[in-house]
Amino acid sequence: MQKKIDKKEGKINWSEDAKKIIGKINGLFPTPGAFFTFKGERYKILKAVIGNGLGKVGEVISNNLEVACSKNQSIKILEIQRQGKKPQKISEFVLGSNIKKGSIIINV
């Protein structure tokens, strides 16, 4: 019998490398999903790819929501779902989001 996956296991640890984070996003899609929190709100990452940007771990390094992780790697988020909202392509999401370049999204 398989162990049920707890929602907490979906929390993204930005100090992991990009390949591991992408594996979590893909492996936990569609439920329970991989997520991060920002200013008390949960954001579920639905689709992402490995980027090549540099920055501090957990830092948003582009206006199109690319986030730095360990080993000088990054994750480019392509599709996201804000808590209680419908899924959005990142090009739509960034228009009304308060997550901007320079924001830090470290999960505590």
Regions found by a protein language model. Give the residues of each.
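An anion-binding loop in the catalytic cleft
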Residues: 15-108
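Acyl-group handling in specialized metabolite and lipid biosynthesis
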Residues: 3-16
